Amino acid sequence: LKFIELANEIAHQNTVLLQTTMGAVAVTEQAIVNEAHRRGMIVPGRKYRDKQAEPVTAAGAYVATPKKGLHDWIGSIDINSLYPSVIRALNMGPETIVGQLRPIITSAEVNRAKSQKKSFAAAWDNQFGSWEYQAVMNKEKGTEVLVDWTDGTSVRMSAAQLYDVVFEANNKWMLSANGTIFTYEFEAIIPGLLKRWYAERKEMQRKMHDAGDNEIEKEYWDKRQLVKKINLNSLYGAILNPGCRFFDMRIGQSVTLTGRCITKHMGAKVNEIIGGKYDHVGQSIIYGDTDSVY
């Protein structure tokens, strides 16, 4: 499989030591630093991390309960690069966060589930966004939310009012399913890096295809497109690792919960097309996992 050649290519493309390629965090971190420097920007120093603090956990991907039995004519729909696409779609980056819905209701619901001896993952079963986010998207006038802005101020308003502030006013803002508000006035570094990696991989795949019967050239481009694939698939997990310089729970959970909403909609729409009912656990859906439905 030529792992040493692959590791060498990863090291050169991301300017890290060969031994650093054995993990994803340091490689991804250096790639983001390189992208910032390419834009003429300076990256802030690493934040102090209290090793004695309790580990933080983000809500994971949606995994449906499979419908048991022998099924005929099964089809699958898979979203291409779900997590990188979510990061790009909402322009997620530490520098584009405008505010955060304080998860008061969400924390209460999760703690209530834990008091019933449920796991953290079980507390999020059939929940496709924070409770505050759902209230905003439902334009609930009777539900009050608290927004913590990045300038240090906080404001209370109804969920319906916040919907208008984010989506109806002239603010260039987007709201993730985690209740994190991002601006799209400028492109964040991480989404820009993902965009470049994705475009470069497509170009390398094209050159690999155009190589025809030239096996040496095909192998050359195949190795390089594989590096881009590894970079793309590694980034989300790396930035959700507390050891990463760019770790931010708001971004990590924004990715997973927004991904949940997309997968839920995909399953519900597929069931509607086949069975006539918009329902993500409808009769036509037998399973779903992270970025796919069956």
Annotated model-derived regions:
Residues 34, 94-186, 191-192:
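Charge-dense polyanion-binding interfaces
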Residues 1-94, 100-101, 107-108, 112-114, ...:
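Common nucleic-acid-contacting/processivity interface regions adjacent to the catalytic cores
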Residues 201, 232, 282-294:
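Catalytic palm active-site di-aspartate
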Residues 2, 6-12, 37-41, 88, ...:
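Generic surface-pattern signal
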